């Protein structure tokens, strides 16, 4: 009986890890000079290895998702270009 309870608890723990929400990590940078703004990506498809395209004050960068909210996904769109962005 105890092994069945343990198996159920183990399964629930596994499912809670798999089904947890994922977010872009919060950027530690609060501001960036316009000449330093660069986009490494515009959408998630531009990233590899399960990383996401996340927006920061210095541009869009591929980051691995985290379970802590606070970051922002890159909006992408037709106007998004990779490389240095001069406004």
UniProtKB/Swiss-Prot annotation:
Modification note: Contains 5 disulfide bonds.
Subcellular location: Secreted
Disulfide bonds: 24-54, 32-58, 41-53, 42-80, 47-62
A molecular function GO annotation: toxin activity
Keyword Disulfide bond listed: yes
Keyword annotations: Antibiotic, Antimicrobial, Disulfide bond, Secreted, Signal, Toxin
GO cellular component terms given for this protein: extracellular region
Signal peptide region: 1-20
Keyword Secreted: yes
Highest taxon, organism lineage: Eukaryota
Gene Ontology biological process terms, A to Z: defense response to bacterium
Cited function: Has antibacterial activity.
Similarity remark: Belongs to the venom protein 11 family. 01 (wap-1) subfamily.
Name the UniProt record assigns to this protein: U15-lycotoxin-Ls1f
């Amino acid at each position: 009986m105890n092994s069945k309870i343990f198996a159920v608890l183990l399964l629930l723990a596994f499912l809670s890890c798999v089904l947890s929400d994922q977010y872009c990590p919060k950027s530690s940078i609060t501001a960036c000079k316009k000449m330093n703004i660069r986009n490494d990506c515009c959408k998630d498809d531009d990233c590899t290895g399960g990383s996401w395209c996340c927006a920061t004050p210095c541009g869009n960068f591929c980051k691995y998702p985290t379970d802590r909210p606070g970051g922002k996904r890159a909006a992408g769109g037709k106007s998004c270009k990779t490389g240095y962005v001069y406004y």
